[in-house]
């Protein structure tokens, strides 16, 4: 009767024939770790060139200066303008394509502005988190809330957020044609203007803080951003399924990049571990990683 190999010998044999080694030298572990790390954690998304049109013609009447600094980790709340005011006054612009060209709305029962406000605000929050911002998106979930003081509205939610020390930004698209003024920031009034407001104004343009006698959102501490008039290249790139995703990325990235600069948030990166130091070898012109240690042969089994 043949002798049965010991447990240690069997374990050693299994280790040798295993396709996945249970232990690897340090240099191999490091190379595998490097290969698993993404080369660029932010910015690897589709973009298309988007012309947001003219900047606010009221930029020359800017009567405010955003100087209040915010902590780089300040909680940021992104809101979609008119998301809670559909089928009522103040539902937002229909856009040139629907109002003038007779195109069907992007979603029945909702103005195109509200539709794009939702898409853009959501994308800003998504890319903002990738960029390292402490940011989230709020959707009231109910498209018609007639009581402005209802706790579910943008205004009520944004006000609570600001009172708790956060920063709130409501996304809008301006009216087309002569009714529109252009892209720009309508800064918050409650709480005072911040460096984020100032940076956004430099990027997009600005409105006076008391535009139309101080609007409801700024009065509650919520900054409003008009991305641009809902017409021309901007509207076309958003409506075209072939360019829509890239257009949303491009617009959202402009906002995210501007906020990150204002807050001084460094671009996130993944630290690539360095290879272990190798002893100097003057005999060779180029250093190579040490080969894996030789594994002794298993004991002979009688």
Positions of predicted regions on the chain:
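Catalytic-site microenvironment of enzymes
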Residues: 2-21, 25-302
């Amino acid at each position: 009767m043949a002798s049965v190999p010991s447990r240690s010998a069997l374990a050693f044999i299994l280790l040798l024939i295993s396709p996945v080694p249970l232990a690897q030298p340090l240099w191999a572990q490091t190379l595998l770790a490097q290969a698993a790390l993404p080369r660029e954690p932010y910015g690897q998304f589709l973009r298309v060139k988007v012309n947001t049109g003219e900047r606010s013609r009221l930029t020359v009447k800017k009567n405010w200066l955003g100087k209040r600094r915010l902590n780089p980790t300040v909680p940021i709340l992104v809101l979609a303008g008119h998301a809670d005011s559909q089928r009522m006054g103040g539902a937002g612009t229909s856009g040139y394509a629907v109002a003038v060209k007779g195109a069907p709305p992007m979603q029945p029962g909702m103005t195109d502005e509200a539709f794009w406000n939702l898409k853009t605000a959501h994308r800003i929050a998504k890319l903002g988190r990738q960029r390292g911002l402490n940011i989230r998106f709020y959707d009231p979930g109910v498209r018609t809330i007639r009581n402005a003081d209802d706790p579910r509205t943008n205004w009520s939610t944004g006000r609570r957020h600001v009172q708790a020390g956060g920063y709130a930004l409501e996304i809008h698209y301006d009216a087309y044609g002569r009714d529109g003024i252009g892209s720009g920031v309508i800064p918050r009034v409650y709480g005072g203007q911040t460096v984020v407001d100032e940076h956004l104004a430099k990027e997009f343009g600005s409105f006076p803080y008391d535009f139309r006698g101080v609007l409801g959102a700024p009065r509650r501490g919520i900054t409003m951003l008009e991305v641009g008039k809902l017409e021309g290249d901007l509207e076309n790139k958003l409506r075209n399924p072939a360019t829509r995703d890239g257009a949303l990325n491009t617009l959202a990235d402009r906002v995210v990049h501007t906020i990150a600069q204002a807050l001084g948030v460094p671009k996130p990166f993944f630290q690539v571990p360095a290879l272990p130091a190798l002893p100097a070898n003057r005999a060779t012109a180029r250093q190579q990683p040490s080969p894996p240690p030789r594994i002794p042969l298993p004991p002979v089994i009688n």
